[in-house]
């Protein structure tokens, strides 16, 4: 069990990609903190993990765009486990609209949840990682942050911002044996994408050379690799998990 004795915080882990990441890390021995604004979803995920794996899993309801909530989340983690080794900044939302119609609230909300949260969570954990002289931070960006998308100026800006943040943080923290990397998923089959109109899904699939949507487990496997010793000499990287979509 390569992550035995390690503690991971995963934001937005109540469902979808975040849940898959939490399950993957737990399956390899990590104790996990399931953070989600949806308290019931977080508790369900934590309960499922405890029933399947011989690890500890706690659920914390938090708004990761709120500094107080984030600091409390990290304090609760330290209180329960005494350390934090992995931070997976996965929480994110969309509020799609053409620029001409996009409201300031739609812009601000996406930037806060998708980008500001990455700053707040990272800042809150690094003092503990510095003390340990060890840490792995993985930020979930998107291919939309690399190529843009009609109707998603807010989301694309937030996800592009994560890429710049990842590279800057990687430079700042490397001397403390803390790596910071990002994963940029493409079209991944989740509850959110399943709600899209069929014609939209078909159009997205045409852009994927591998000819299929990705699965949350595809992303989780790359995150687990970046947390492992196999990736100890990798930092500041942006790894696309997109079936070739953004080649």
Which residues does each PLM region occupy?
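Active-site helix of classical SDR
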Residues: 122, 158, 166
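Residue(s) in the substrate-gating loop at a strand-loop-helix junction
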Residues: 142
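Canonical Rossmann dinucleotide-binding motif of NAD(H)/NADP(H)-dependent dehydrogenases/reductases
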Residues: 2-33, 169
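C-terminal substrate-recognition "lid" of short-chain dehydrogenase/reductases
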Residues: 2, 130, 134, 178, ...
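Substrate-binding pocket helix/loop in short-chain dehydrogenase/reductase
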Residues: 98-99, 106-111, 193, 204
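The beta1-alpha1 cofactor-binding region of Rossmann-like NAD(H)/NADP(H)-dependent oxidoreductases
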Residues: 39-40, 61-72, 104, 218
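Alpha-helical segment proximal to the catalytic Tyr-Lys
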Residues: 127, 171-175, 232
């Amino acid at each position: 069990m390569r992550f035995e004795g390690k503690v991971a915080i995963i934001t937005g882990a109540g469902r979808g990609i975040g849940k898959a990441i939490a399950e993957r890390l737990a399956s390899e021995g990590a104790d996990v903190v399931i953070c989600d604004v949806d308290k019931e979803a977080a508790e369900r995920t934590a309960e499922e993990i405890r029933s399947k794996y011989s690890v500890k899993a706690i659920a914390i309801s938090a708004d990761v765009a709120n500094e107080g909530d984030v600091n409390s989340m990290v304090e609760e983690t330290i209180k329960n486990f005494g350390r934090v080794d992995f931070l997976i900044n996965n929480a994110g939302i969309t509020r799609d609209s053409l620029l001409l119609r996009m409201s300031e609230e739609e812009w601000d909300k996406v930037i806060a949840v998708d980008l500001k949260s990455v700053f707040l969570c990272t800042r809150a954990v690094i003092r503990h990682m510095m003390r340990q002289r060890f840490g792995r931070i993985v930020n979930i960006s998107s291919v939309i942050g690399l190529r843009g998308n009609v109707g998603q100026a807010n989301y694309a800006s937030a996800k592009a911002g994560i890429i710049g943040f990842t590279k800057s943080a990687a430079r700042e923290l490397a001397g403390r044996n803390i790596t910071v990397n990002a994963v940029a998923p493409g079209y991944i089959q989740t509850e959110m994408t399943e709600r899209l109109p069929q014609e939209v899904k078909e159009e997205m699939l045409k852009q994927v050379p591998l000819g299929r949507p990705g699965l949350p487990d595809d992303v989780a496997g790359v995150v687990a690799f970046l947390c492992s010793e196999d990736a100890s000499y990798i930092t500041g990287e942006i790894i696309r998990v997109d079936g070739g979509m953004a080649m």
